[in-house]
Structures are given as structure tokens and as C-alpha cells.
Amino acid sequence: MKFTIERSHLIKPLQQVSGALGGRPTLPILGNLLLKVEDNVLSMTATDLEVELVSKVTLEGDFEAGSITVPSRKFLDICRGLPDDSIITFVLEGDRVQVRSGRSRFSLATLPANDFPNIEDWQSEVEVSLTQSDLRTLIEKTQFS
């Protein structure tokens, strides 16, 4: 697996997905983020087994398909610490991911992607559409619970 992406395209979706992870995970894999590259799309998935968040970013340029998990907190901290206009390259080498940007180099331990829990998609026969204001009102009325 290999891909290159601008920090500005990565940081916001990465922060949103990392929000699914709580404090201390019960299983080591739950502290990781699933990175999957296929068809010039990077998908990032995080879960705590109750909630799963997925964010997708279109990749420009060369990439190699694949999937792996990386420590979410360390990965986010590395990306946050890089300058806004950075170009970040990720290369899977054995059981480690090399994160490179300019003269900076980081190496992160990985866990296999097939160890990452898969919350299955489900389809409902019932569909509900709400406006943003209606949803907000409903949440505010039940927020005390």
C-alpha cells in the first residue's frame, strides 16, 4: 500500500473519524484506524464497536491499493504537527507504515486490516427524512436523558 496526499485534504476527515474512538479501548485494534486504498479513494474507518465512522478522500496521483490499521492517536498527532501545505506520503513496509513529509520521517507499527472489526451494513425498509432544524429540535427535547 502506498499513497500521497495533501495534509489539507487529510486532516479534517481524519479528525472527524478519530472522534469515534473513546479514551482507552478495550481491545488494542479499537485504538487503530483502518486505512484502505482502492480505486483512487482513501477510506478511513474507526469504531468503538457501537459506533463506526468512515470518511473517504479522493487521491490524486500515484497510489497502490491495500489496507492496514495504524494507531489513531499517533497518526493524528503526526498529521496535525506537519505544516498546512505539506504533502504526506504513506508507504507500507512489512509490518510498519512510513509516513514522510519533507525532511520529516515517522514509522508506525501496524496491525492487520483483517483484525479490524467489521460492523455490517444494514438496510431498513423504513426511511425517515428530517430537516436539520427538526432533527435539532428532537435532539434538544431528548438531550436531558
UniProtKB/Swiss-Prot annotation:
GO CC terms of this entry: cytoplasm; DNA polymerase III complex
Task of the protein: Confers DNA tethering and processivity to DNA polymerases and other proteins. Acts as a clamp, forming a ring around DNA (a reaction catalyzed by the clamp-loading complex) which diffuses in an ATP-independent manner freely and bidirectionally along dsDNA. Initially characterized for its ability to contact the catalytic subunit of DNA polymerase III (Pol III), a complex, multichain enzyme responsible for most of the replicative synthesis in bacteria; Pol III exhibits 3'-5' exonuclease proofreading activity.
Subunit field text: Forms a ring-shaped head-to-tail homodimer around DNA which binds and tethers DNA polymerases and other proteins to the DNA. The DNA replisome complex has a single clamp-loading complex (3 tau and 1 each of delta, delta', psi and chi subunits) which binds 3 Pol III cores (1 core on the leading strand and 2 on the lagging strand) each with a beta sliding clamp dimer. Additional proteins in the replisome are other copies of gamma, psi and chi, Ssb, DNA helicase and RNA primase.
Entry keyword set: Cytoplasm, DNA replication, DNA-binding, DNA-directed DNA polymerase, Nucleotidyltransferase, Transferase
Originating gene: dnaN
One GO process term, biological-process aspect: DNA strand elongation involved in DNA replication
Designated name of the protein: Beta sliding clamp
Family: Belongs to the beta sliding clamp family.
